[in-house]
Amino acid sequence: MRLIAAIVACALSLAAPVVSQDRLPDPVATFSILGYDPQTGEVGGAVQSRVFAVGNGVLWAEADVGIVTTQAIVDVSYGPKGLALLRAGMTPQAIVRALLDSDPDPGYRGQPWPKGGRQFAVMDAKGNYAVHTGPEATAWAGHKTGKFCTAQGNILAGEAVVNDMVAAFEATDGHLSLRLMAALDAGQKAGGDKRGMQSAAMLIVKKNGGVWLNNDTVLRLQVDEASASDPLKELRRLVEYWNTRQRPPR
């Protein structure tokens, strides 16, 4: 029991947040989907937002461990901390509680950056998941869970965004990348982020599932800036290009 407590304490001490005194960061208003394919063993996620380079801090994944998405009033350290706790054998539900309990609720230049606004989801390598939307996440904010998937978002047009994402993921056949992409498209069709579109990303992992030797990254795609057009259109082009030219590992 002491060993487990020590592992948890060590994991939660990783990547402690560094509070910038220069500016108040913008909330990562976004919608995202995490999903698992029991046939391939792949786990992955995809995200779209009206911020630059959303893929840089929202999605965190490790083969044979799981995936974490952290957004809204975001603490990026939830990503590596969540993976460390998964690696230590904790359940997604326990990890959600541990991350919130250990959050110091910091402020920026005297302004609150409340953990009540955090939104994050944790999925293990077998598709088990837990998700949290804090009461201070900017409306509309919430999540919807489904079979081997969870969709979450904030500053959205409404609840239909996450509902339609889950429905699209469950109804779509083919590789996990196509199912994640279908979910993003459905979320945008339902209204998406109320502020518009700018960037999108996708990350899928599996042990030795990538090209070349000792590569666990099946797919890592980022469209960092497309505010004048449609980041999902470009992300879909890349996903479809990969699917026509690669034979995804099984």
Predicted regions and their residues:
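N-terminal nucleophile
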Residues: Q21-R250
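Bacterial N-terminal signal peptides
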Residues: A5-A15
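Sec-dependent signal peptide recognition
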Residues: R2-I7, V65
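Sec/Tat signal peptide C-region and signal peptidase I cleavage site
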Residues: A16-S20
